[in-house]
């Protein structure tokens, strides 16, 4: 059995659903132990999350883009003229706001969960994950702001960081549920072994003064810069600035680092006679607690000791045909030695760690309102940064069908509405419904899709039915 499944950001539209099996483990592994399902097998799925505030596509949505693609023109080429009918117009923002770029995605391989003696959940899973975050990028580095800076007049650039990685995680899940007189208490854990393909980070540690000398050269005062990168594939890339020809060698799929991580969670459910299942549920969890150790084909560079001034001639830098040559040239200019910037052949970076608090209340049979808070934190100097989330998600749910409308506040300032559903063994949704249907400046999107098999009896599809405590064994398999 081979499969994949993609997760776009937090996928709150389906992860609070009691009948999505291992999907619940990614927000709180204790929820799996308290699940009404006897077993859950993921088959296929896909997901993606991307959001940024550097550029945009004018007045469009994903559905509109599907009609107009591939007719695309940039605002620079139009030079103030109206775009041809049926064309998409790309542009960049000219605003004083700091910039950010965020991307995440996951491909899940064989994933299985089953119950033992009703109170114990056991699972195995593999995920291929990718993430990139760049935050607090100074607005002066925006295209228009930078272009409008006068020559020979210095301006300041404040500190910012960026980090990215592609990695595989192989893990096991275990959870157990303790029955009380009026409900249950559950605990769960996902233990993961991570293998990293590509990763790296960049950081400007201190404020620096940047001066445009000409269109081809700049001067930088006190550039306190650090960066790290895996070199297995990037060293196979070369570029000739004269001929504009790029050469890319045969890419390799190798692991350059490893590490362990864990998701830990606990939950409590209170039941009453008014509804099947629980009346309310609360949980707390720690997610992606771990560090990546990159030790093979890895480089960590630093400008320390910080030079008083660094002058870069872009015409000279263009003669470098590989990333390695470019690194050596800048090191020679900044530190007087082409090898001085290379401080180590290994580096560490934190995974997208976060603490999460969840709540869920069943008002009447099958009608719930759930809430989730996710607050990221870092374990290292450089980290893959998760997005802070505050979400409220009303939903209708039974064994065979669910509909959820999450309202999500990201990073405590950007509100979005989502829509998600489950029809038997198919789950689908988005945490950014507006990107699909609302014409506006398009800056990113979010969607997810999954197919699974679990203990549901299809002949009873329309009869609904709620969860009965300690009745896992009576939830039948799919019937065909």
Predicted features, each with a name:
Residues 9-480:
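Subset of outer-membrane beta-barrel
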């Amino acid at each position: 059995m081979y499969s994949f499944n993609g997760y776009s950001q937090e996928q709150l539209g389906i992860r609070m659903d009691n009948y999505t099996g291992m999907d619940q483990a990614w927000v709180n592994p204790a929820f799996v132990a308290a699940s009404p399902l006897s077993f859950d097998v993921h088959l296929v799925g896909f997901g993606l999350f991307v959001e940024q505030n550097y550029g945009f596509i004018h007045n469009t949505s994903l559905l509109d883009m599907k009609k107009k693609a591939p007719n695309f023109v940039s605002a620079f080429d139009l030079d103030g003229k109206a775009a041809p009918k049926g064309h998409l117009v790309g542009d960049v923002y000219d605003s004083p706001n700091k910039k950010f770029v965020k991307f995440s995605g996951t491909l899940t391989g064989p994933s299985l969960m089953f119950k033992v003696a009703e109170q114990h959940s056991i699972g195995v899973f593999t995920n291929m994950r990718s993430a990139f975050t760049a935050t607090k990028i100074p607005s002066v580095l925006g295209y228009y702001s930078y272009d409008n800076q006068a020559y020979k007049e210095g301006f300041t650039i404040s500190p910012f960081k960026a980090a990215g990685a592609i990695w595989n995680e192989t893990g096991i899940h275990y959870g157990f549920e303790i029955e009380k007189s009026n409900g249950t208490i559950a605990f769960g854990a996902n233990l993961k072994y991570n293998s990293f393909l590509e990763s790296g980070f960049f950081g400007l540690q201190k404020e620096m003064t940047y001066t445009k000398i000409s269109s081809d050269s700049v001067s930088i005062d006190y550039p306190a810069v650090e960066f790290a990168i895996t070199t297995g594939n990037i060293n196979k890339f070369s570029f000739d600035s004269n001929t504009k020809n790029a050469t890319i060698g045969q890419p390799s799929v190798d692991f350059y680092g490893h590490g362990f991580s864990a998701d830990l969670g606990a939950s409590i459910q209170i039941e009453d006679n008014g509804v099947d299942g629980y009346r309310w549920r609360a949980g707390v969890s720690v997610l992606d607690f771990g560090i990546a150790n990159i030790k093979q084909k890895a480089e960590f560079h630093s400008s320390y000791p910080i030079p008083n001034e660094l002058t870069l001639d872009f015409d000279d830098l263009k003669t470098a045909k590989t990333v390695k040559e470019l690194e050596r040239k800048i090191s020679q200019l900044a530190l007087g030695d082409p090898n001085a910037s290379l401080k180590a052949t290994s580096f560490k970076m934190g995974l997208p760690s976060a603490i999460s608090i969840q709540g869920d209340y069943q008002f009447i049979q099958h009608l719930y309102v759930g809430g989730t808070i996710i607050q990221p934190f870092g374990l290292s100097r450089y980290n893959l940064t998760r997005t802070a989330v505050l979400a409220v998600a009303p939903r209708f749910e039974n064994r065979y069908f669910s509909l959820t409308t999450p309202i999500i506040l990201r990073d405590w300032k950007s509100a979005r509405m989502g829509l998600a559903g489950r029809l038997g063994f198919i789950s689908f949704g988005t945490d950014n419904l507006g990107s699909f249907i609302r014409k506006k400046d398009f800056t990113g999107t979010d969607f997810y899709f999954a197919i699974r098999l679990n203990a549901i009896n299809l002949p009873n599809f329309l009869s609904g039915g709620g969860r009965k405590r300690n009745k896992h064994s009576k939830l039948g398999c799919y019937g065909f």
